[in-house]
């Protein structure tokens, strides 16, 4: 099964901006690896909350549409809220 997430590049970095994004229903994330520069991104929480329940999300290549370009990535790490059904941050690596 293939998964696609629409994302935008983040311009503001830091704890305060990440909190504002989460409060607005967004998930901050980063894409790194393969000798490339890390890219900070943000996407809607609703885009990932349902697809992350499937086991193959963690092993298959996920397509992120980042500012009009498609990027193939794999989920490396995911931080979740302690008791709310909420994802706080995702680390992706280039596939």
Swiss-Prot record:
InterPro entries: Rbsml_bL25/Gln-tRNA_synth_N, Ribosomal_bL25/Gln-tRNA_synth, Ribosomal_bL25_long, Ribosomal_bL25_short, Ribosomal_L25_dom, Ribosomal_uL5_bac-type. The keyword Transcription regulation does not apply. The keyword DNA repair does not apply. It comes from the Bacteria. GO terms for cellular component: cytosolic large ribosomal subunit. Gene3D superfamilies: Ribosomal Protein L25, Chain P. One of its GO terms (molecular function) is structural constituent of ribosome. Keywords: Ribonucleoprotein, Ribosomal protein, RNA-binding, rRNA-binding. GO terms for biological process: translation. PANTHER family: RIBOSOMAL PROTEIN L25/GLN-TRNA SYNTHETASE, ANTI-CODON-BINDING DOMAIN-CONTAINING PROTEIN, RIBOSOMAL PROTEIN L25_GLN-TRNA SYNTHETASE, ANTI-CODON-BINDING DOMAIN-CONTAINING PROTEIN. Belongs to the bacterial ribosomal protein bL25 family. Part of the 50S ribosomal subunit; part of the 5S rRNA/L5/L18/L25 subcomplex. Contacts the 5S rRNA. Binds to the 5S rRNA independently of L5 and L18. This is one of the proteins that binds to the 5S RNA in the ribosome where it forms part of the central protuberance. HAMAP family: Ribosomal_bL25 (MF_01336). This is Large ribosomal subunit protein bL25. The gene is rplY.
């Amino acid at each position: 099964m293939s998964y696609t997430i629409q994302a935008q590049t983040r311009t503001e970095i830091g704890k305060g901006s990440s909190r504002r994004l989460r409060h607005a229903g967004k998930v901050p994330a980063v894409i790194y690896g393969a000798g490339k520069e890390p890219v900070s991104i943000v996407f809607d929480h609703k885009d990932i909350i349902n697809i992350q329940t499937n086991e193959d999300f963690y092993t298959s290549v996920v397509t992120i549409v980042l500012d009009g370009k498609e990027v193939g990535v794999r989920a490396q790490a995911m931080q979740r809220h302690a008791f709310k059904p909420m994802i706080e941050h995702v680390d992706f690596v280039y596939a």
